[in-house]
């Protein structure tokens, strides 16, 4: 049986990347929350 996670850099960035987060209002909320929490890495 094939494993469910077949990593692809392009897709990962498109869905979870910084520019993807910045492109929507809720994505910006996510980044703000991660900044507030003090995350070293904000996005993938």
Swiss-Prot record:
Keywords: Ribonucleoprotein, Ribosomal protein. It comes from Lysinibacillus sphaericus (strain C3-41). Belongs to the bacterial ribosomal protein bL34 family. Pfam families: Ribosomal_L34. It comes from the Bacteria. Residues 24-44 are annotated as: Disordered. GO terms for cellular component: ribonucleoprotein complex; ribosome. GO terms for biological process: translation. This is Large ribosomal subunit protein bL34. Residues 26-44 have a biased composition (Basic residues). GO terms for molecular function: structural constituent of ribosome. HAMAP family: Ribosomal_bL34.
